[in-house]
Amino acid sequence: MFDKLAAVAARYDELTELMAQPEVATNVTLLQQYAREQREIEDIVNAYREYQATQRAIEEAEAMLEDSDPELRALAQEELETQRKRLASLEEQLKLLLLPRDPNDSKDVIMEIRQGEGGDEAALFAADLFRMYTRFAESRGWKVEVDSLTENGIGGIKEVIFQIHGEGAYSQLKYEGGVHRVQRVPATEARGRIHTSTATVAVLPEVEETEIEIKPEDLRIDVFRSAGHGGQGVNTTDSAVRIVYKPGTPEEIVVTCQDGRSQIQNRERAMTVLRARLYAREQEKRQREIGASRLAQVGSGERAEKIRTYNFPQDRITDHRIGQNFSNLPAVLDGELDKIIEALIIYDNAERLRASGVST
């Protein structure tokens, strides 16, 4: 591990020297390339140099233990214990930093929420989840754009497709894909019986046009009059867009977008969703081919996987992937997802470390 760290630090210094050269400083493309590469390894280099400084501090403290002054020796012992703890912490941090990064972590995200089993109560729960993710995004200053929304007429959501734009959006929300289950007494339940309902969530990284090739001949594009929420017509022009990829084949994908201001905007958004779905399909195929373990796929987003239960009577949220419970359910549904996401990231990192076999 430390040989690799030394090589990364040497490359960082080399990049600094390269960017100072006149022929590079005047070449914008090359300068940006070097700057991007340096940013990607900056955290590793900073942690490694702090590790080296901590090692030196330990050596100095050990030398002070030989001093004749008992007070100085006591101070040295205290410093030694502090620095050794810091060294162990930095070593774990470096192991994590050396793990391959998910190339999608910095991307924006596309989310799809659909009501599952449970009728109207499932649709109401889907609306709760949509509000939860919207509030979570807003608390971070991220932008939310709705591509398509189908309501059930009583405040519930049958299906919603939306995009979240913000730094690291996918890295935070990629763990939300799967089946979410709610246990509560519906407002319409006169006898106070607890009902169980579900909603499915899909999480997709937004994909650049250059990352996925889509042939025009594989598409059928329909335009129609946009409908308002609840099915009410609101538009006198054919602004809504439906894109069908490879219609009539097993590979068919249908994407509809009608919440944009124009047909052009709806078409662009629909293509964005289509690219994301095709990318996700390719990723899932690749994972199956290499036999990736389920433990290493906490954020796989498979819709058949029950990932979390929201138990209202007991004010308890259980994430089944990590076997951990969380309280204060109303706050979580109001967007306070930080503790849950942090626990999932810690679990995922630990599993990746175990699978990688990184050692010193």
Curated annotation (Swiss-Prot):
Entry GO MF terms: translation release factor activity, codon specific
Cellular component terms per the entry's GO annotation: cytoplasm
Claim: Cell division is one of the keywords in the record: no
Keywords assigned by UniProt, alphabetized: Cytoplasm, Methylation, Protein biosynthesis
Keyword Signal found: no
Residues recorded with modification N5-methylglutamine: Q232
Entries under PROSITE patterns matching the protein: RF_PROK_I (PS00745)
Any Pfam family the entry gives: RF-1
Subcellular localization, as worded in the UniProt entry: Cytoplasm
NCBIfam families (alphabetical): prfA (TIGR00019), PRK00591.1 (NF001859)
Function: Peptide chain release factor 1 directs the termination of translation in response to the peptide chain termination codons UAG and UAA.
Family of the protein in this entry: Belongs to the prokaryotic/mitochondrial release factor family.
Listed name of the protein: Peptide chain release factor 1
Species of the source: Chloroflexus aurantiacus (strain ATCC 29366 / DSM 635 / J-10-fl)
